[in-house]
Amino acid sequence: MIVFGAIAPHGNPVYEQPDGPTANGMHELARRLEASGAEAIILATPHGTLLDGHFGVVRSAHLSEHPNQFVAAEHLYEGEGEPELAFACLDTLYHAGLPALGMTFGTTAEGGSTMPIDWGAGIPLTFLSRPAVIVTPCRVLSNEQHVRAGQALAVATGNRPVAFVASADHGHGHTHDGPYGYSEHSKPYDDDVQDIVRRNALGELVDWDPARAKDAMADSLWQMLILHGALGTGFRAELLSYEAPTYFGMLTASFQREE
């Protein structure tokens, strides 16, 4: 059972600005996650092992954030995977008629496998530390298929209390001096995402053209669609923080079960 949902960023300002709004938002997400009683996390990242034409599900029992240009060595995440839950996720995705593949690293025996994970998983899990199943979206699949994937992943949890985290940064073209240059579409995209979260209206994302996210240079749409499917109804949303301190937008939001 999904007991908690979150949109969490994966940008390094969360470490560089420990008193900033994003870091404070992440600490608040951690408090709410603890209060939810979630024993494990299913986390969707846009930067993991991306499979042509398929959703990806990490089956490994151990997770280790690989060295990367965004995260200092002292912040690299080490934690546990959730092989049993991963198998259930794959089973429900298959039965939903969705293309999905399981992944291990180094060995097919999940108990002996340590999967190198990306900053998109490692940064949120540093704050929201739980045994986790890492999943990756697939941009050639439709919005509706991403929602159905979220629904299938929720079914996989059974009666176990599990949280779903959409790791997402938004428009990456807020400044002219960023690595991707300026995009006039980044701010409107981010403004509309904030509005959707405030109104608890993730379902509206289903009608968004993915080209809009691409024009805004955002990596967030697909994970939020999966989150929408996983949550269904019966959750209240709260936007905890938003900022674009560099070239990309970062947002923290919680989705808690209604009493």
Model-predicted segments: where are they?
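Catalytic metal-binding/acid-base residues of hydrolase active sites
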Residues: 47-49, 170-171
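Beta-strand elements within well-structured catalytic alpha/beta cores of enzymes
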Residues: 39-45, 160-168
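Non-transmembrane, aqueous-exposed alpha-helical and coiled segments at domain scale
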Residues: 51, 151-156, 162
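Flexible, D/E/H-enriched segments
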Residues: 1-39, 50-147, 178-259
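Alpha-helix C-terminal capping segments
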Residues: 125-128, 153-157
